[in-house]
């Protein structure tokens, strides 16, 4: 509806992806490379139809007391970043954290995982950076290299045989 009314040449899905990238950019600094990339790729300029559509979207969410998926992640991250007993207690409840399909997480989700696991004993991440398919939704396979930078003691176990499908597939 907003896309049509604002004469945007974007589908609702494309608009949602723009909104998601902008929210992440406002909240998170995922290394200088990510922030630079986010700034270079910004599509929001004050006064444009796109700016107006995003602003109306945010206003409607607020008016109706709603959260989109990014808002839920951002709110969870903000709660975990608080330096209080509640946040420490929550993070301490989990000694082991496993993240599957790690190649499909966003920088925001990466930061959430790190905060969630800050008192954990073990963090297991499973994925294949060569199979990242959700870049259009904000996932970034660079989270793998960031993980290895943040946890140089991590053991990497590579599987060299494809157990999912035969060679003909």
Indicate residue ranges for each PLM-predicted region.
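Short, small-residue-biased leader/transition segments that mark boundaries at the very start
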Residues: 1-4
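Conserved helicase NTPase motor core
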Residues: 42-146, 158-165
